[in-house]
Each structure stands twice: as C-alpha cells, then as structure tokens.
Amino acid sequence: MRKTFRIEHRTIISLLLALTLSATAAAQTPASATSQTASDPGLQRLEREIARLSTVSGGVVGVTAIHLETGRRVSMNGTERFPMASTFKVPIAVQLLTRIDKGEVKLDQMIDIKQSDLHPGSGTLADLFNKGGLALSVRNLMELMLLISDNSATDVMLRTAGGPEAVTARMRSLGIEGINVNRSTAQLIADWIGVTNLPPEDRWNPAVFSVAFNAVKPEDQKAAAKRFDADPRDTSTPDGMAALLERIYHKDLLKPESAELLLDIMRRCRTGEARLRGLLPQGTEIAHKTGTIGGTTNDVGIITLPDSAGHIVIAVFVKSSEKEVAARERAIAEIARAVHDFFLFQPRAAL
C-alpha cells in the first residue's frame, strides 16, 4: 500500500485529505505589481489571465515566469511560500553538482544502497528491492532522482550533497533567499502524514515505514496535513525557484558541463505529462521537475520557444487544494500555455 504515500506521481491518491480550502478570488490576485508590469498593458493582461486560470485548481496558486532573452516577467503570489514537494530535488542537484565541480564527489563514484536507504514514495528502488545489497553511481542516482523522482535515490543524493543545511547554504550563497531545504523526503512524508515515532535512520526499512504510516489515525493525519501546509520548511517562493532556474540556464552557478548535464536530465523528465507540458504544442522542448504531496501540485522548468523566440523560465505552485490532482494539473497546463503563447507572439512590450 506504499503508493498511498507517494510524494510524486501523476495519479496520486491523497491519503484521507481534508485540507482547509483557502483559495478565493482574492487569493489569486497578484501579491504586488512590479513597475515592469505596471507599464506594460500586455503583461497586465497576462497577469489577469493567469489569475483567472488559477481558479480551476481549487487552491492557492503561485506563478513566476521570465522571458530570458528580454527579461520581461510576470508574477502572481511570487513572494509567497509554497511546499516544494519533489521540486526540491532541483536545488539538491545543484548542490550535488557543486560538490562534483569541486572534486569532492565523482559522477562515476559507486554508492552502496542499504536497506535503511529504501524510503517510501515515488520511484522504483523501494518497489524493486526490500533489502539493500546493490550499488549505483552518483550519475545513475541523480538521474533516478530527477527523471522519475525516486525518493530513495533522492535521500542518498541529499546525504551525498552534504545534507539539507548544505543545500540551503548553497542557495543563500547564490543570493536566493526564497528556497529552504530542511528534511529528507522520508522525514517530509512522515511529517505530512503525522508520524512521530520513527526509529533512528539506521533502522529504517520499508516495513518500518508501512507500520508507522498505517498507525496514524485519519483525524491526526488531517491535522498533520494542515500543519504541513503552514510549515516554512522545504518551501520555495515562485520568485526564488525562477531565479534558480534562470541561473541554471545561464550556466553561471556550475561548470558549463555540469549545468548542461542537469538540463539534459530535466529535459528527459518522465513525470508530469499533464502539467507544464500538458497543453504545449507537440514537440516543445521543456526541461522541468514536478512535485506532488497532499494538496500540493507543482511543476517548474524552462520552456524553449520555437523559431528562435527565446526561452521561458516558469515556476507554478499549487497548495491547499481539495480538488483532484487532475484539476490542479489542468490549471498548471493552461497557465503554461498562456505564458508560452504570450511570449511567443509578444516577445517585447508594445510601443
């Protein structure tokens, strides 16, 4: 029954969720208008359209989108914090690759996977193996983390990157204040469900997780989910995530070959077919990473426009939604298409 607790899966089934729905029309209005938007009627219209499309999600939506070649940007609730869910695997990858660039870790370095490394949620390692005894390279584990959002691989990579504190410190060193990484995926899921009695990490295994998760009463899980939505840990602002993606694209925070490796893996992402890429024209190139937990559904990435029209960094977060995942995904897809078409046909402000 481990799928009940998936943090990342297109067909996620929320575990007895009854999150408070706080989305209203007022919640979807932009938190503040930038001077750029105020002087650009086209961006103002796009901002209003994003707010309108957001209501489909049934939750609170945050969006930041930047046309990289011109710097034109639109933001709605851009400074509000949202649970990252598995989108936090992007900053983890950045810190991991930073260590690789410094020679502290090697891509071909083999890492033994122990039974205590098999964690709940999305991916394949915990599904295929219930004991340790295998070894995978850092490159393979990073690919599992980003391609299929494998939580076991993620927690091994988080440890290899130096832990949550090192990831957050790297974000601060880049001048990005909006991203906090504080817990492993296993700890994050346990907090969302309301588990308070997990043993020390070296005694973790799939059976331990299953027993602990199934022991939580529905009313306790509901209360834990509400606390989770208000918790500043493992959150990002749309502006913060967009800033990180912009730096990744410009390849000024990693060695060029490391930045390109990260982008290549993100282009091959196998999750979230109905999100950012869901309504984009067939063949549109997008490097992205999704995230899902409870009432949260996210997708962040870089869209390549056709006909040399440039690139768009976009971060879309949905939180506190009681609607089914499909409705949240539809909102993300419609917002992405609106942003795509706007910057394709109006790359510069009208005179």
Task: Explain the meaning of each model-derived region.
Residues A31-I193:
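Active-site-adjacent loops and short helices of periplasmic peptidoglycan-processing enzymes
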Residues T29-E49, L53, K226, A230-L351:
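Structured C-terminal helix/loop/strand segments within mature extracytoplasmic catalytic/sensor domains
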Residues M1-H9:
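N-terminal secretory signal peptides that target proteins for export/translocation
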Residues R72, L128-N130, A223-K226, V316-V318:
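A short small-residue
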Residues T11-T24:
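Bacterial N-terminal signal peptides
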